[in-house]
Amino acid sequence: MSSIKIECVLPENCRCGESPVWEEASDSLLFVDIPAKKLCRWDSLTKQVQRVTMDAPVSSVALRQSGGYVATIGTKFCALNWEEQSAVVLATVDNDKKNNRFNDGKVDPAGRYFAGTMAEETAPAVLERHQGSLYSLFPDHHVKKYFDQVDISNGLDWSLDHKIFYYIDSLSYSVDAFDYDLQTGQISNRRSVYKLEKEEQIPDGMCIDAEGKLWVACYNGGRVIRLDPVTGKRLQTVKLPVDKTTSCCFGGKNYSEMYVTCARDGMDPEGLLRQPEAGGIFKITGLGVKGIAPYSYAG
């Protein structure tokens, strides 16, 4: 077993860092700071970080096949021109719910951008429940709604054979699976594949590795856990020096490194003294497993 190394590669002080995505073409990590309305790009070679501030909370970002990026900003799916620091609205959801915003999002293997909504929090993980929905933005910019009654729409990914969609609604304390139709984007037959244990706290962002196992960041649990979605067993726990771990992705050379985002919001001064790296970007090496490249939006 190789020895696992955890380091804070960027002391960013994110209020709520989220949605890490590796951009292979630029050796960069994209991520967002939701309440700060910031989209960030960290160059792993120069160690420089560029930040763009939007006019509403930015909750997820993804690569786009035609260049640039797509992001969920407020309740809008947007296309981003990084150089011009501008966003073009592609679609808007939840028009009837003024207190809602998007949360986590990710592109599926067919190039659709899946993302879900939630009510704005009054404090971390404190919010009006059942207000969210799960959507996807198709390449032709039409939006499909899958279901509503969501608390905090969160981590999502697809099995390596593209037949299963994995999804987290945080306050269900469960990682769920659906049958998934790659051609149509339909999902069906929801079931739970893992229920979190008490010390694991709240399931947040998620990614899949090259062996088809799931990695889940546990908010307030200070860890990422590796799950086998077939057996429902936890295979590994990696603890970080911060409690509010929010999301994870693979990146770096051959996708052999894991990047983890975290949050500072909701921590008291004593907690921040104890965890000075809270809000930073962490890199985990030596996991002995690789990830897969992120999919790009096809529209």
Swiss-Prot record:
GO terms for cellular component: cytoplasm; nucleus. It comes from the Eukaryota. Its cofactor is Zn(2+); Mn(2+); Ca(2+); Mg(2+). A divalent metal cation binds at E18, N154, D204. It is found in: Cytoplasm. It catalyses: D-glucono-1,5-lactone + H2O = D-gluconate + H(+). Belongs to the SMP-30/CGR1 family. The active site is at D204. GO terms for molecular function: calcium ion binding; enzyme regulator activity; gluconolactonase activity; zinc ion binding. It is an enzyme of class 3 (hydrolase). Its main location: cytoplasm. The keyword Zinc applies. Coiled coil: none annotated. Substrate binds at R101, N103, E121. Gluconolactonase with low activity towards other sugar lactones, including gulonolactone and galactonolactone. Can also hydrolyze diisopropyl phosphorofluoridate and phenylacetate (in vitro). Calcium-binding protein. Modulates Ca(2+) signaling, and Ca(2+)-dependent cellular processes and enzyme activities. The modification N6-succinyllysine is found at K144, K244, K253. Its EC number is 3.1.1.17. One of its GO terms (biological process) is intracellular calcium ion homeostasis. Keywords: Calcium, Cytoplasm, Hydrolase, Metal-binding, Zinc. Monomer. It comes from Macaca fascicularis (Crab-eating macaque). Binds 1 divalent metal cation per subunit. Most active with Zn(2+) and Mn(2+) ions. The physiological cofactor is most likely Ca(2+) or Mg(2+). This is Regucalcin. The gene is RGN.
